[in-house]
């Protein structure tokens, strides 16, 4: 046998041995029907609601799902066969702390994108859930408590909140997107740097949405108080929205209105334009100021009792739309 062939055979044998070693060490299982999608309970994390008033979640790659439960116990579970090994859960002075352990290279390779920590919060629970990840998604659904505050954030993961009836919602991402739907009551604050914000089916008092470069979309929202919107270069699009007042500001992003009902609109922009349709325009008042952006189709009726003030330096104004 030639020397080159011996070298190739030796390398092949080493690769096979390494594969067997890694597979056995990590316990990989490639059988789809045996992959662990069922929850794995952290029995030590079950604690009566009265003993826990703050849930702190700090994760890196793992996703976190937050749900409601009729039980009187805050519980933590996991999805994924290796997830329990990646998570530390401790109750300290009324604070339930959930953190992600630093894994070695081989264990990180064995992890699945579907792995997640699952937290169940009792109905009418009094306290705060503060969940933050680096790249994992955050999803909260079905929470019902007039004295519950939800704070959810991620650097690059998406943050989603749906079917919530709680006191306050605070959402934030750096590059991940924000999704909010079916919100009842409570103040809503959502901010992102480069992700986009999508909100639909909301009935609440006050709401504040902001983005640097991502777009903001609001659909089917009813506010008794103020809707505050801010974007640097992203677009702001409102459809079927009613609010006591709307305060919007952009640097270069446009504001588009479609079936928007409000008593007062204040829009300020450097080069962004504003256009669209306002309902009950005879009762509408406010101010629009832009340096070079255009104003189109936004106007009160001639017999309106309130005043709309429009200012622009070099932008066009077309109040006939």
Features from the language model and the residues they span:
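Positively charged n-region of N-terminal signal peptides that target proteins for export
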Residues: 1-6
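Hydrophobic membrane-insertion alpha-helices, especially the h-region
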Residues: 8-25
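Short linear S-[DN]-x-LW-Φ motif typified by the pepsin-like aspartic protease active-site region
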Residues: 26-101, 108-153, 158-163, 168, ...
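Extracellular repeat turn/loop positions enriched in glycine and acidic/polar residues, especially those
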Residues: 122, 132, 153, 172, ...
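Short, surface-exposed interaction patches in beta-rich subdomains
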Residues: 143, 159-164, 168-169, 178-321
């Amino acid at each position: 046998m030639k020397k080159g062939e011996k070298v190739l055979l030796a390398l092949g044998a080493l690769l096979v041995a390494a594969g067997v070693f890694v597979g056995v060490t990590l316990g990989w299982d490639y059988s789809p029907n045996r992959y662990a999608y069922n929850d794995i309970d952290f029995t030590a994390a079950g604690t009566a609601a009265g003993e826990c008033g703050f849930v702190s979640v700090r994760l890196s790659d793992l996703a976190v799902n937050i749900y409601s439960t009729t039980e009187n116990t805050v519980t933590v579970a996991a999805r994924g066969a290796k997830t329990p090994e990646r998570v530390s859960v401790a109750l300290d002075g009324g604070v339930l702390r959930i953190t992600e352990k630093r894994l070695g290279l081989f264990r990180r390779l064995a992890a699945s994108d579907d792995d997640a920590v699952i937290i169940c919060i009792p109905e009418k629970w009094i306290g705060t859930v503060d969940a933050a990840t680096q790249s994992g998604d955050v999803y909260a659904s079905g929470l019902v408590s007039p004295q519950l505050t939800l704070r959810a954030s991620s650097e690059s993961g998406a943050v989603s909140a749906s079917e919530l009836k709680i006191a306050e919602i605070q959402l934030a991402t750096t590059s991940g997107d924000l999704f909010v739907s079916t919100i009842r009551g409570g103040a809503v604050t959502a901010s992102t740097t480069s992700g986009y914000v999508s909100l639909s089916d909301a009935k609440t008092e006050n709401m504040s949405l902001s983005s640097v470069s991502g777009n903001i979309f609001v659909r089917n929202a009813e506010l008794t108080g103020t809707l505050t919107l801010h974007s640097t270069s992203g677009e702001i699009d409102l459809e079927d929205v009613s609010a006591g007042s709307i305060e919007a500001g952009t640097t270069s992003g446009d504001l588009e209105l479609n079936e928007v009902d409000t008593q007062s609109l204040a829009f300020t922009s450097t080069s962004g334009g504003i256009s669209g349709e306002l309902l009950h325009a005879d009762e509408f008042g406010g101010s629009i100021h832009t340096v070079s952006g255009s104003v189109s189709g936004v106007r009160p009726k001639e017999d309106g009792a309130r005043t709309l003030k429009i200012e622009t330096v070099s932008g066009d104004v077309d109040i006939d739309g």
